[in-house]
């Protein structure tokens, strides 16, 4: 009977070692950071290079739409560039977490700053979204007219930058959740 129970135990799959799970989560953290860097920096570059000139009648009578004409767009560029720079500087800590998955001190530091960067990126994207809403739809009560009918490429490029920024917000939220999950698992293992 002992032989039968031993063979039944041999058929059960063994759970993966704890170190592999942690290392896998650390690699996922690193990849999410790379994606978020791409999203934030592409949003900042797309908005920072956004301008369009509309010529009326002659070359001397022109209307310009540039990102720096609106303070919300300036804040958007600064916020996304700041978050992108932070994510770039956090990569060595993420790599260290891959090498030493049991080090919780760096994970606590990353979860704190990741949460701050979620707020910074969200506020920049929200401010620019409010301006884009008025640019697309206007506001008849205040006599603000829609400019996107005339400045199509300006509005399209700004909308693309907003999409990249909101994608970065989602990636940052995933980073915070991943870090919280990793910290919770480390506490449970002790």
From Swiss-Prot:
Q: Which residues are glycosylated according to the annotation? A: 51, 69
**Where is it mainly found?**
membrane
Transmembrane feature ranges: 25-45, 73-93, 108-128, 158-178
Superkingdom to which the source organism belongs = Eukaryota
Q: List the Pfam families.
A: CASP_dom
Keyword terms: Cell membrane, Cell wall biogenesis/degradation, Glycoprotein, Membrane, Transmembrane, Transmembrane helix
Answer whether the UniProt record assigns the keyword Transmembrane to this protein: yes
* UniProt membrane topology term: Multi-pass membrane protein
- State where the protein is found: Cell membrane
In Gene Ontology terms, what is a biological process of this protein?
Answer: cell wall organization
Residues in compartment: Cytoplasmic: 1-24, 94-107, 179-190
Spell out which residues lie on the membrane's Extracellular side.
46-72, 129-157
Q: Which GO terms describe its cellular component?
A: plasma membrane
User: Known InterPro entries for this protein?
Assistant: CASP/CASPL, CASP_dom, CASPL
The UniProt family comment states:
Belongs to the Casparian strip membrane proteins (CASP) family.
State the function annotated in the UniProt record.
Regulates membrane-cell wall junctions and localized cell wall deposition. Required for establishment of the Casparian strip membrane domain (CSD) and the subsequent formation of Casparian strips, a cell wall modification of the root endodermis that determines an apoplastic barrier between the intraorganismal apoplasm and the extraorganismal apoplasm and prevents lateral diffusion.
Subunit comment: Homodimer and heterodimers.
The name on file for this protein is Casparian strip membrane protein 1
Q: Which organism is it from?
A: Pinus taeda (Loblolly pine)
